Amino acid sequence: MKDKTINTKSFNFKRFSIYGGQSGMPVSTDGVLLGSWINLAPESLVLDIGTGTGLLALMAAQRFEDALISAIDIDQHAIDAATVNIEQSPWQDRISLHHDSVLTTDFSQRFDAIICNPPYFNSGEQAQQSQRATARHTDSLDHLQLAQRCFEITTDAATASFILPTPEGEGFIKLAEQCGWYLAKRLDVKTTDKKPASRILFELSKDPVCGQDLQRESLTIHHQGGYSEAFIALTKDFYLKM
């Protein structure tokens, strides 16, 4: 039987490179946006859920020099690629990898922050390429279970940051609020000025005060045939040509 596994495209950033291997998770604008946007408290203990090739963990390590990051993924191909990327980075001493499910892992301590680019296909046929399907289909990580688990394994002062397409993001926020989370920050992302927002980046908090003082902003990626000044300012520490 022919092996249908597809090698995943690699990508170079200013201070690290991402080897895709057979992870099924090529570098995406979504991941770069989230990694550039998150905010972490000093000396945070961070969990990157569904790390894929390790992109978010590496971005967090670059931006926050005293953060300790655990990165978890259920897929062995993802862990294999992430291992290469982390070992070749300047921050391998601050990132640990775990091949397991976040839903069943017994963590030894609670986290100060969650970062996650979660799956979002709620219906329809899964992609033929199996790793890609697993990475993007909510059958492998239900949003309600994810929100609840994030609440359980974090400290009282913790934050949890995600990026999702707008409809799925709206739904996730409602589910998270049922679990005790409050929406603290939100960034609505448009590809161009003429299109509606296609992505939501959002930060959840356990503090009710944050829910009463929502910080909401918007960002347009492309402007007049190039990248917008706001997008460049957000991502310039990572993209080579910014």
From Swiss-Prot:
GO terms for cellular component: cytoplasm. It is an enzyme of class 2 (transferase). Gene3D superfamilies: Vaccinia Virus protein VP39. It is found in: Cytoplasm. It holds the Pfam family MTS. Belongs to the methyltransferase superfamily. tRNA (adenine-N(6)-)-methyltransferase family. Its EC number is 2.1.1.223. The keyword Lipid metabolism does not apply. This is tRNA1(Val) (adenine(37)-N6)-methyltransferase. One of its GO terms (molecular function) is nucleic acid binding. It comes from Vibrio atlanticus (strain LGP32). It catalyses: adenosine(37) in tRNA1(Val) + S-adenosyl-L-methionine = N(6)-methyladenosine(37) in tRNA1(Val) + S-adenosyl-L-homocysteine + H(+).
